[in-house]
Amino acid sequence: MSFSKKYPHLFEPLQVNQMMIPNRIISAPLGSLTDKSVSGIGMIIRGTSGSVPGPRSRMAPGSYCFANMQESQKVREQVVTIQQRGAKAEFELCHVGQYAYVQPGDYAIGPVGFVREDGIEVKAMDENMMNEVADAFAKGAVDAKEYGFDMVMLHFGHGWLPTQFLSPHYNKRTDGYGGCFENRVKIPIQIVER
């Protein structure tokens, strides 16, 4: 049996709101987009760990982020290449929270404060920090639209900052952002609503 007969819907277009994706094959933000864009994939996701603008959002230095304006022309060219070859371009926004790569003397942020094994301080986020992070996600989404991306994905998995708030393992807060699920989900909801 042929692949297309075994999975007939895989190669059908998919309507998402006003956007039509040419098929249901979506590529994660890994590897070379040039190779992917000639392969017939319906949507190619770009982004990296810590793509939300800000000094404490990245997993490693040099992460793919709009905050680095030297990348701007390269990003626009990549989006155009993806779209010219018939695929849709999606940008993945994520913030790594307590796992952030920071400069010596700086700190990471998370639901609770502690010192990591590498000696980096993680500061418990106050409401101002929470608002700054939600604003940074919103700015990243606006930037993605300005760069020509067709869609934005908010990456709340892999233990990144929103998941750190959702998880009772990481979130030991005793205020209105910890404890029951309704409290722990407040920051992810705030990010989505921005």
Which residues are covered by each model-predicted region?
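Flavin-dependent oxidoreductase catalytic cores
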Residues: 1-194
